[in-house]
Amino acid sequence: MQHAHVIGLGKSGCAAALLLRQQGWQVELSDRNAVAAPPELVSQGVQFRLGESLDPVAWGWQTPEQRPNCIVVSPGVPWDLPGLRQAAEELQIETLGELELAWRTLSDIPWVAVTGTNGKTTTTALIAAIFERAGLQAPACGNIGFAACEVARQQQQGEAKPLDWVIAEASSYQIEAAATLAATIGLWTTFTPDHLNRHYTLENYFTIKASLLDRAQQQVLNGDDPYLRNQANATSRWPLAFWTSTQGAEALPTSRDRGFWIEEGWVIDRGDRLFPVERFSMVGNHNQQNLLMAVAAARLAGIEAEAIAEAMANFPGIAHRLERVATWQGIELINDSKATNYDAAWVGLQAVPGPTILIAGGEAKQGDDQAWLDLIQAKARAVLLIGSAAPLFARRLAEVGYSSPVENAETLDRAVPRAVELAQSLDASHVLLSPACASFDQYPNFEARGDHFRRCAQAIAKG
């Protein structure tokens, strides 16, 4: 029996372990932070090393009979961990990510794979909604929805209807560990500096993202993204790629016969009018960019315009991305917890109409904050800060001359009611959580942060 070692007890790691057991592997799972083994994995015969970091020497892997045939790595596990590098480089143990394992299981099914610094979650959800409206079995998975290995496990076990497509959101963490994933359609939404604590340089980050499109049969890129359009040499790297633009055909970096654009209020597919953009239920230019990317994927997959238009008109949006969670005395409270960097937070604040009380902060990331700070000066009546980034953000706001109130609320429990008070006194129409930060100083993930904000907001709305 072949032996696999899975690192990480999160959603992806558990799904990988169950898929491997279903395929007949002996599976051991480790997690240095976990203390309890999930009963559903124990019942399937998965073995555990909890509270331990990978250590090939201490675990006896130098003896060939003791070492695993492969290591499956969850997305949150850095690839430069000393023990992992030793296992992969010195002991020559095959090392792959959970998404790669799912691909190897489902490679006979066409995939749409979506990556990008920002916009990929909404675009992935839009694509899945369109495919569903068209009557296709095409679940969203990867960095959204199910873990990809859970989709693969259900398909292999016959627990779900046969798949027509797989719609995968792929983060840079997942792509770097998915060396053979070759999507039928690969999409790249945006590119700005992010995750540099993991990838170290912008060039490394770009190379990882680009590899997904290198292996895809067809590529779709956002022509409104300055980096992809002007600095990435993308038109020469992928000369047959399709491009999108909300600014009309003239703004495309390619010919019209490889373009999707908006013109005179219509969504255009390579010169053919599909439907009025006003049928799309979500607001904001960035969401029109996401819309065009999703339309391109759907049309390349052969889906008719009417199914696309119906899906667009009924799309509710996604949790934690400009999610309207409550209204109190005319003040809208909006959860944008997924805005984990400056660019995403700029997009969120820009999309909210009217004067706003902004809640920001968390675990700060590297990046250029100037455009975000400029927009705060223009739109925010006050800023409430939370988390470890609060002193940094307060200093930066002072440095750019922001003269409206800035308060360190420390936590959302304090920030949300105070934001509502300030909205009343300063005549602001919206309270927006758009942190521009990771969540890990106070929460396990951005979803938990957004859920907490939603509870706080709804408690106020209920009085």
Curated annotation (Swiss-Prot):
Its main location: cytoplasm. This is UDP-N-acetylmuramoylalanine--D-glutamate ligase. InterPro entries: Mur-like_cat_sf, Mur_ligase_C, Mur_ligase_C_dom_sf, Mur_ligase_cen, MurD. Its EC number is 6.3.2.9. It is an enzyme of class 6 (ligase). GO terms for cellular component: cytoplasm. It comes from the Bacteria. Disulfide bonds: none annotated. It is found in: Cytoplasm. One of its GO terms (biological process) is cell division. GO terms for molecular function: ATP binding; UDP-N-acetylmuramoylalanine-D-glutamate ligase activity. Pathway: Cell wall biogenesis; peptidoglycan biosynthesis. ATP binds at residues 116-122. SUPFAM superfamilies: MurCD N-terminal domain, MurD-like peptide ligases, catalytic domain, MurD-like peptide ligases, peptide-binding domain. It catalyses: UDP-N-acetyl-alpha-D-muramoyl-L-alanine + D-glutamate + ATP = UDP-N-acetyl-alpha-D-muramoyl-L-alanyl-D-glutamate + ADP + phosphate + H(+). Keywords: ATP-binding, Cell cycle, Cell division, Cell shape, Cell wall biogenesis/degradation, Cytoplasm, Ligase, Nucleotide-binding, Peptidoglycan synthesis. Belongs to the MurCDEF family. Coiled coil: none annotated. Pfam families: Mur_ligase_C, Mur_ligase_M, MurD-like_N. Cell wall formation. Catalyzes the addition of glutamate to the nucleotide precursor UDP-N-acetylmuramoyl-L-alanine (UMA).
